[in-house]
Amino acid sequence: MNRDQALLNRLWSRVLLEELSRLGVTQVCVAPGSRSTPLTLEANANTAFTLHTHYDERGLGFMALGLAKASQQPVAVIVTSGTAVANLLPAIAESKLTGERLVVLTADRPLELVGCGANQAIVQSGIFSSHVTASLELPSPAIHHPLSWLLTSIDEVMARQALLGGSVHINCPFPEPLYSAGDEAIYQPYLQPVQRWREQARPYTQVHQGLVQSVPAAIDGLLTKGVVIVGSLSLQEAQAAKRFAKAMGWPLLCDPQSGISSQWAHFDLWLQHPKAREQLNQAQCVVQFGSRIVSKRLLQWLEAWCATGLGEYHYIAPHSARNNPWHAMQQQWVCEISHWVDAVLSKRLAGQHTQQGWADELTHYAQSVRQLAQLHFSSSSLSEVALALDLTERATQADLFLGNSLIVRLVDIFSALDGREVFSNRGASGIDGLVATASGVQRARQKPLLMLLGDTSLLYDLNSLALMRNPAQPTVIVVTNNDGGAIFDLLPVPSEQREALYQMPHGMDFAHAASQFGLAYCAAQTLEHYQTLVEEHFAHGAGTLLIEVKTPPQQASMHIKQLTSQLHAL
């Protein structure tokens, strides 16, 4: 048989990508590079794929993360060899903690060119370490490696990903030449053993994984006073959890990432009140749906409650990752949340006594927080707390993406989001890649998007504003500029070094950045001005509007301390 390595590289890539398509991949994110040519050209030729491109691999990885987050489907990423691969690590580390499924296809030099001084060659095998769910180190394409082996190897790592979530890494060495106009007919004998697969549309290996739908055996643990905590979930999952709490008559404490709220909102503040905490301590059961709680006060209460050993702690999530940082006794249910709720309620409410309304008095504290906050921030004064309060009513038909650091904490404390699709990166909680992730979310959902993030976060991901130039739906990015890391005003860092080593003020604004990337820009002057900008852009605008809100560095922390002091006086 004649040999054409470039053609063989292409056939190998075609089979790999076709199998990924049959396993649910429809979105492929591509960065430029020559060594990845076989993968890039075959992805482009496969009509089942929608391609997204970006010149910055770090941003590309986060865009893929956003696509996977919003679509809840695996998303492929194609990059060339060398440091391009290393730039994907932040997004992969995030996906490890939050479960988004990335299929990372990294082109590589063949083995004989690694570690010998060849250009653009680093050790890529195992580069992502424990941050990936599974890895597959492919050999260079050769006819003595059967395509049936390639297919079953892909199916194995993808089945593991389907079960556990997170990213998989498939390293793909391609010898040169990489370009050819040769006739593929010379490789028909090589393709023949997988002819039946080529003629069908299903995966080579079909893995049928069981669903956990049984009624929990420990149902008696739910016959008492309970608390329901809702963490980072899709809106549909969160609404199932809310249905459970309502049926039980238990207090419902909702993280803003869930997109729902309740009468017990603003708990990060009222949990600091001794009487409120004392009443919540009467709980004899905690049922938590989803992970990644923002509120430090709620996490502290949960840790202290678990330490008493006086009740059952149930944790329900679709994936089996451990979510138990205080290592308490726990009943963990790995299943679809709606399945668990339906199973429990069908048995739990069959004429059995319930502790309905045992913690309704706590709603008084939530109302007090809301009233105090509105009293302080009902004027036209523009502040970060005012933005968080306003978010409850603002652009309610748009998807919401929350940045990390200070803004997500303010939203957690002061907002009461209900019925919103909320997205965030609260796995590793880094401030990198937030704009790119939001771009991926919108590309998947094709809906208007409102994003809130801080100035340092935007500086970190400035390159990714290029991804926001032509969104499918109107987009508003709100950057709160407090000139550095104002979050450190809430932390006990050394006061002498706070500004120089923690806050790191930069003295910049974002007008020229918006201009460079072709985005509309406006600096909001008052709260009413901000509200008008947001609503008019969503009603009549197109493209992306960057709204900058400048605030004094210590203002937010001062406001929180004032409200906390007044709440204690109640």
From Swiss-Prot:
Recorded catalytic activity of this chain's protein: isochorismate + 2-oxoglutarate + H(+) = 5-enolpyruvoyl-6-hydroxy-2-succinyl-cyclohex-3-ene-1-carboxylate + CO2
Note describing how the cofactor binds: Binds 1 thiamine pyrophosphate per subunit.
Keyword annotations: Magnesium, Manganese, Menaquinone biosynthesis, Metal-binding, Thiamine pyrophosphate, Transferase
SUPFAM superfamilies (alphabetical): Thiamin diphosphate-binding fold (THDP-binding) (SSF52518)
Taxonomy, superkingdom: Bacteria
One Gene Ontology term from the biological process aspect of the record: menaquinone biosynthetic process
Enzyme Commission number(s) of this protein: 2.2.1.9
Pathway: Quinol/quinone metabolism; 1,4-dihydroxy-2-naphthoate biosynthesis; 1,4-dihydroxy-2-naphthoate from chorismate: step 2/7; Quinol/quinone metabolism; menaquinone biosynthesis
One of the record's GO molecular function terms: thiamine pyrophosphate binding
Subunit architecture: Homodimer.
NCBIfam families: menD
Physiological role: Catalyzes the thiamine diphosphate-dependent decarboxylation of 2-oxoglutarate and the subsequent addition of the resulting succinic semialdehyde-thiamine pyrophosphate anion to isochorismate to yield 2-succinyl-5-enolpyruvyl-6-hydroxy-3-cyclohexene-1-carboxylate (SEPHCHC).
Family under the similarity heading: Belongs to the TPP enzyme family. MenD subfamily.
PANTHER family, per the entry: 2-SUCCINYL-5-ENOLPYRUVYL-6-HYDROXY-3-CYCLOHEXENE-1-CARBOXYLATE SYNTHASE, PROTEIN PHYLLO, CHLOROPLASTIC
The protein, known as: 2-succinyl-5-enolpyruvyl-6-hydroxy-3-cyclohexene-1-carboxylate synthase
Native species: Vibrio cholerae serotype O1 (strain ATCC 39315 / El Tor Inaba N16961)
